[in-house]
Amino acid sequence: MSSRSYKRVLLKLSGEALMGEDAFGINRSTIVRMTDEIAEVAALGVELAIVIGGGNIFRGVAPGAQGMDRATADYMGMMATIMNALALQDALKHKGVDTRVQSALNIDQVVEPYIRPKALRYLEEGKVVIFAAGTGNPFFTTDTAAALRGAEIGAEIVLKATKVDGIYSADPNKDPTATRYARISFDEAIVRRLEVMDATAFALCRDQKLPIKVFSINKSGALKRAVSGEDEGTLVHV
């Protein structure tokens, strides 16, 4: 049985990850598989918080938002993350995982507002906490929300779940000689111009000395291995 390497982690899930093989929306088999992985990690005693994106439903920078006021489009994207958070909470509930959703936008009939002390208490009680609506402000990505919430709750690491199994020297889909980094420093990533997160999120993690691990959400058991400190994905460190 794997042991946990981290006590408290922040998991960043993209909305696109929920689509599976579908063109948009939430793929049921995909979200069930994800909740299996999350439940397995929660069972280790890891205090787990999640920031989820909304790109499977709407993105403020997507072609569909062209001609729209950027702030309005971003608020629509934030509401999409709330829909995803509720879907994830429901799926986790069916796995017996006690989960709370906190939103940076107030929709009192549906979700709790984000209140840091309450979020910390939930984590200490062993509940999974899903942070929705990004930072609550337009012009900021959910990557930035993940960095911000990770710093606020005192997470030991941000786990960024993507479609690739780490950070590569080049695009592995275009360059067969591309190699995966097992570890790389923040400064090295900047020098090599590797896109780990958007610049604001990356700078916040670096300034707060909050490491990032990039791994594939599509690999079975990858989340548990990442939490257990095994050689999974790429670790970005100070």
From Swiss-Prot:
Subcellular location: Cytoplasm
EC number in record: 2.7.4.22
Disulfide bonds: none
Keyword Membrane among record annotations: no
Pathway(s) served: Pyrimidine metabolism; CTP biosynthesis via de novo pathway; UDP from UMP (UMPK route): step 1/1
Chief place of localization: cytoplasm
Catalytic activity: UMP + ATP = UDP + ADP
Gene Ontology biological process terms, A to Z: 'de novo' CTP biosynthetic process; UDP biosynthetic process
Mechanisms controlling activity: Inhibited by UTP.
Enzyme class, spelled out: transferase
A GO CC term attached to the entry: cytosol
Subunit structure: Homohexamer.
PANTHER family: URIDYLATE KINASE, URIDYLATE KINASE PUMPKIN, CHLOROPLASTIC
Biological role stated in the UniProt entry: Catalyzes the reversible phosphorylation of UMP to UDP.
Family note: Belongs to the UMP kinase family.
The protein's name in its UniProt record: Uridylate kinase
Species this protein is from: Bordetella bronchiseptica (strain ATCC BAA-588 / NCTC 13252 / RB50)
Lineage of the organism: Bacteria, Pseudomonadati, Pseudomonadota, Betaproteobacteria, Burkholderiales
Gene this chain is encoded by: pyrH
